[in-house]
Amino acid sequence: TWSEPTFAMKFNDYEEQLVYWPRDNKLKNSQISGSASFIDSSIVEDKKSGKTILLADVMPAGIGNNNANKADSGFKEINGHYYLKLKKDGDNDFRYTVRENGVVYDERTNKPTNYTVNDKYEVLEGGKSLTVEQYSVDFDSGSLRERHNGKQVPMNVFYKDSLFKVTPTNYIAMTTSQNRGESWEQFKLLPPFLGEKHNGTYLCPGQGLALKSSNRLIFATYTSGELTYLISDDSGQTWKKSSASIPFKNAT
């Protein structure tokens, strides 16, 4: 017997639904174009704390490996700290950052706004949660259709219709479980490991490493021409990286 599935990380911009996917040559390669997503997770059990630690690639609405901005981490460094950048609807530039306690700052004035982002990356105005309309998908008249379905869900900076949006690049998120996967903490984004002007590395999906000889955890990731190992010696509280070039050409 099996229990009901538990999602360690989940977005609600699109309905959780079963879709009959056509198998004909014309439609079988159709792709949903507007959803935020998680992909390529990797998991390990930390013997020191007993926690299960899961990392995954995070993609904003409509973004994947092929179209992610490779020259932007999505973060801004201020006084040695990295803060998530946001662009407001109607703006051409990313003029806002998410600072301590989730307060959204206007970078032009360096002053707080009336907006905040909570630990789920949802947007609030004056402490009140904002919403967007959820999407559903179906096939109609020989094409894939993505349509609003009338259900309001909390606005999230990774969503297509959010008032504030993150940079269209790839990120890495981490979540932990204290009960071997029965329930999970809210995910948090890891800081950039390759600087402000480089997108995040991509996780090698599957399993991380917990070394027997120490409390070290290691997750393998990759970027163009390079392997980058994410390392934690404190049960995932902090991370550092160690990179190695790939000894052959045309590798990603």
Describe each region flagged by the PLM.
Residues 1-252:
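Asp-box/BNR beta-propeller blade signature and adjacent active/binding-site loops
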